[in-house]
Amino acid sequence: MPELPEVEVTRRGVAPHLEGQVITGVALRHTGLRWPFPATLSQTLAGRTVRSTGRRGKYLLIHFDHGTLIIHLGMSGHLRILPSDVPPKKHDHFDLEIGPQLLRLTDPRRFGAVLWHAAEDGSIENHLLLRTLGVEPLEAAFSAQWLYQQTRNRSSAIKQVLLAGDIVVGVGNIYASESLFQARINPKTPAHRIGLARYERLAEAIRQILAAAIEQGGSTLKDFIGVNGQSGYFQQNYFCYARTGEPCRICKTPIRQIVQGQRSTFYCPNCQK
């Protein structure tokens, strides 16, 4: 699943093509993806100008004066900017037409989403999918103190707390494993047993790893590609994720794989205590 870095890479890629541009049409090739497409989306967007783009966790936001288009890439989706005459393929479900170009959503597994939040319904932060999200890990509100305070009553394993998204948002399976490795914290450790000093290491690791992943175009394991059609290459720098049985890059101990909350977790049993 595309995580925060992949969505931010996508946002940065589409922003120059969308911001300030007038939507000339919308193409919907199914009734919906994970949820139905808004019934009047074509009429809602045609002739309107994109004011800005944003991101909240793993959600891409395209802002208009009268509301916000919310796009989620699901398990395997990606967005491309293409000439308007490029014919759609089997898994191309949604086009946002902008004159001679279009923004196309490709989603083979159809777990993504295209939704509309009208300005008259209040702040986009009030949307059902966004209202319970935690702080953004690359913004000032995220800190070791925040992690420490928010986890005093959380007995769940720290890896699962990071994935929950209600304390810090967008740190998915890949980057949670990598951040915990860099911070030298065992992913099974109950969150409330981690002290402020170790949360200092974890907060810094999360910031550094997410920033590096964005600069390297995200991670491409199966499906993700950037807006320009290029794959990300952060996966070349993994220390533990998807390296089961391989020697730790620090101490040579074999990387171990376990399952937490139906998700695979990778860690070094020697480096991460």
From Swiss-Prot:
The keyword Transferase does not apply. It catalyses: Hydrolysis of DNA containing ring-opened 7-methylguanine residues, releasing 2,6-diamino-4-hydroxy-5-(N-methyl)formamidopyrimidine; 2'-deoxyribonucleotide-(2'-deoxyribose 5'-phosphate)-2'-deoxyribonucleotide-DNA = a 3'-end 2'-deoxyribonucleotide-(2,3-dehydro-2,3-deoxyribose 5'-phosphate)-DNA + a 5'-end 5'-phospho-2'-deoxyribonucleoside-DNA + H(+). Binds 1 zinc ion per subunit. A zinc finger (FPG-type) spans 239-273. Gene3D superfamilies: 1.10.8.50, MutM-like, N-terminal. The active site is at 2 (schiff-base intermediate with dna), 3 (proton donor), 58 (proton donor), 263 (proton donor). Pfam families: Fapy_DNA_glyco, H2TH, zf-FPG_IleRS. This is Formamidopyrimidine-DNA glycosylase.
